[in-house]
Amino acid sequence: MQGPHLSPLVLLLATMGAVLQPEAVENLATNTRGLIFLEDELWPPSSPPEPLCLVTVRGEGNTSRASLRVVGGLNSYEYAFLEAVQESRWGPQDLATFGVCSTDSQATLPALQRLGAWLGETGEQQLLVLHLAEVIWEPELLLKFQEPPPGGASRWEQALLVLYPGPGPQVTVTGTGLRGTQNLCPTRDTRYLVLTVDFPAGAWSGSGLILTLQPSREGATLSIDQLQAFLFGSDSRCFTRMTPTLVVLPPAEPSPQPAHGQLDTMPFPQPGLSLEPEALPHSADPFLETLTRLVRALRGPLTQASNTQLALDPGALASFPQGLVNLSDPAALGRLLDWEEPLLLLLSPAAATEREPMPLHGPASAPWAAGLQRRVAVELQAAASELRDLPGLPPTAPPLLARLLALCPNDSRSSGDPLRALLLLKALQGLRAEWHGREGRGRTGRSAGTGTDGPCALRELSVDLRAERSVLIPETYQANNCQGACAWPQSDRNPRYGNHVVLLLKMQARGAALGRLPCCVPTAYAGKLLISLSEERISAHHVPNMVATECGCV
């Protein structure tokens, strides 16, 4: 490659807030030149059905680069492709690396150059990297890729089909979805072959990409074996085949237009530290508004802001443990502090009918004991300190937390509403529990037999596929399993409970004899990409219902 060597990159992956322990991050970083990525076995049970990684590339000075959204995991050769694009200066040697014909006028080179420039910029744009879900060799070569997240790529109109080739001739490629006829000119220095795809949605939602490869030599054809060896290059380090990738490019930014013979330019505004990507409805209480922003920052941004006020379902609320809490009673507040379960406070009907949310006020003459208020202040500071030390904390969280603490009394002599400190403490306890749940246990502590105590919930279970001789990749994967007790009240917070099991659990709690006790079983599954060998051919298939993602009692 020409040009200076790229500074060490760090890729930080998060899946719905999944966080690596600092020790694990340090160990991985020392072995991968600063690249950190999660293998399939490391996905926590709380991951979405198709794991979605948010990859942030950081350069020197910890400067944020473009973020990538990856469906599945980012393989080492896929990361190497992105690094090669960013390092390229597009001289003859770089053109040979990507198999670009020197006399070719196709759109592949401009698309590669745009991708390289985009990878070197800062910003909030996102790039989708989709993995192969299925390949069919006869009667036509057909490639179908995994679906992106809902709404994630509907407005994107161009993609790069990246091949990691083995030995092969120069070919002319035609097919559905491609931008006209395209040429591939591999040499001994070629590591990647790239095709430009217009309107790539058909690669996952339609019939797939149908390709026809015609060697440049007159009368030559490629057999299926030659085609497989050419398009699915061998990874000598892992003794596997490297499958194609679909890199969906972000929309091009509008270019400045010239006026009166001169080029008028206007710089894009620098991204500022916004407390929330979407504006929140105005609140009469700055404390409640800031607390809402903190919760949203830690739980992840909403896909689309909505001002719709949702009504609570009385039937759903009836299934939760209920009780009256006198907020003027120090003993009741003390019991509330000892309980770290999520808390739902309902206002009176009169307050609920107000047009504006009512400010939070504590009772003016509440008999708050000095010891109780000191305990709230101490536990609040401890919870805030623990929250600040969480790895992977969003940068918007610390200033929001500092503002909330400033609005709360920190001892019995401080001014401020003591109920604010209590509400903030309960919120931090819930966020801390959810964040730790996303972290999960370390790899060394994982086993199929752990975690049987407690309510029905998703547990980690690794399945060995080496006994299935036809499966080449993966050798092991995280299948998960459901374990735990089914009891009333349900405490695994699964929204898929039916009335039937609710009645059974209530009967069981009353001591009624049941012929069959409710069982903890999977209620939702996700698929898995398997690469198998059949009749001396390698094929990739997306097999459904391979990974348990939710549990419930039935």
UniProtKB/Swiss-Prot annotation:
Family matches, as InterPro entries: AMH_N, Cystine-knot_cytokine, Muellerian-inhibiting_factor, TGF-b_C, TGFb_CS
CDD domains documented for this protein: TGF_beta_AMH
GO biological process, one term: negative regulation of ovarian follicle development
Predominant location: secreted
One Pfam family from the record: TGF_beta
Chain positions carrying an annotated carbohydrate: 62, 326, 410
Cysteine-cysteine disulfides: 456-520, 482-551, 486-553
GO molecular function: growth factor activity; transforming growth factor beta receptor binding; type II transforming growth factor beta receptor binding
Disruption phenotype: Homozygous null mutant males have a complete male reproductive tract and functional sperm, but also uterus and oviducts. Most are infertile due to female organs blocking sperm transfer. Females are fertile with enlarged ovaries and atypical follicles. Furthemore in the absence of AMH, follicle growth is more sensitive to stimulation by FSH.
Signal peptide: 1-24
Tissues expressed in: Expressed in Sertoli cells of fetal testes, and in testes just after birth, but absent in adult testes. In female, AMH is expressed after birth in the granulosa cells of the follicle.
Superkingdom to which the source organism belongs: Eukaryota
Residues excised as propeptide: 25-446
Protein keywords: Differentiation, Disulfide bond, Glycoprotein, Gonadal differentiation, Growth factor, Secreted, Signal
GO terms under cellular component: cytoplasm; extracellular region; extracellular space
Subunit structure comment from the entry: Homodimer; disulfide-linked.
PANTHER family in the record: MUELLERIAN-INHIBITING FACTOR
Family stated for the protein in its record: Belongs to the TGF-beta family.
Protein name per its UniProtKB record: Muellerian-inhibiting factor
Organism per entry: Mus musculus
Taxonomic placement: Eukaryota, Metazoa, Chordata, Craniata, Vertebrata
